[in-house]
C-alpha cells in the first residue's frame, strides 16, 4: 500500500474512532449524573431499567432502519453528523430534565442518535480493517 492510501486510511481511522469515542464519553458523563437525576426526579432502580429498555430498543430499531434504508441513500458522513447532533441535544436534555416522562422520552432520542452513529462507524472500521490488516475493534 502506498503512502497516499496509508494517509487516507489513517485519517479515516481517526475520524471513526472519534465518532465512536464521543458517544461513549457522553455515556460516561451521563452515568456520572445518575445520582443527580435520581435525586431530582425521585427515581428508583426500576426507572433506570425502563430508561435502558427504551434506549436499547430505540437504538436497535433505528440502527437497523438507518443502516439498511437511509444510510445507503444519504451516506455515512451525514448520518454520523446527524447522530452526533441529536446525541448532543438529547444529552443536554437528560441533564436538565424535570419530569419522569420527559426522562423516558429523551431515552428514545438518545437511542436513535446511537442508531445513527454506530452502524456507520462500524462499516468504516470494517473497511479500514480489511484494507490495512489492522485490528481496530476486538
Question: What are these regions, as identified by a protein language model?
Answer:
Residues 8-33, 108-109:
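Pair of pore-lining "gating" transmembrane helices in MFS-fold secondary transporters
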Residues 28, 56-64:
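Residue-level signature of mid-helix packing/kink "hotspots" within the transmembrane helices
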Residues 34, 38, 43-52, 136-137:
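Juxtamembrane helix-start elements in MFS-like secondary transporters
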Residues 42, 96-101:
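Helix-breaking motifs and short loop linkers at transmembrane-helix boundaries and internal kinks
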Residues 62-75:
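Helix-to-loop junctions at the C-terminal end of transmembrane segments
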Residues 78-92:
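Structural signature of the two symmetry-related core transmembrane helices
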Residues 90, 101-109:
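Paired small-residue
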Residues 116-130:
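Intracellular juxtamembrane helix-capping segments at the cytosolic ends
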Amino acid at each position: 500500500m502506498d503512502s497516499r492510501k496509508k494517509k487516507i486510511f489513517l485519517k479515516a481511522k481517526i475520524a471513526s474512532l472519534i465518532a465512536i469515542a464521543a458517544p461513549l464519553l457522553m455515556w460516561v458523563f451521563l452515568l456520572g449524573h445518575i445520582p443527580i437525576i435520581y435525586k431530582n426526579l425521585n427515581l428508583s432502580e426500576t426507572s433506570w431499567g425502563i430508561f435502558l429498555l427504551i434506549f436499547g430498543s430505540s437504538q436497535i430499531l433505528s440502527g437497523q432502519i438507518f443502516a439498511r434504508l437511509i444510510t445507503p441513500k444519504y451516506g455515512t458522513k451525514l448520518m454520523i453528523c446527524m447522530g452526533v447532533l441529536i446525541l448532543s441535544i438529547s444529552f443536554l436534555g437528560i441533564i436538565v430534565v424535570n419530569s419522569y416522562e420527559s426522562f423516558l422520552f429523551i431515552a428514545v432520542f438518545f437511542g436513535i442518535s446511537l442508531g445513527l452513529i454506530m452502524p456507520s462507524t462500524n462499516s468504516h472500521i470494517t473497511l479500514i480493517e480489511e484494507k490495512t490488516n489492522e485490528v481496530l475493534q476486538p
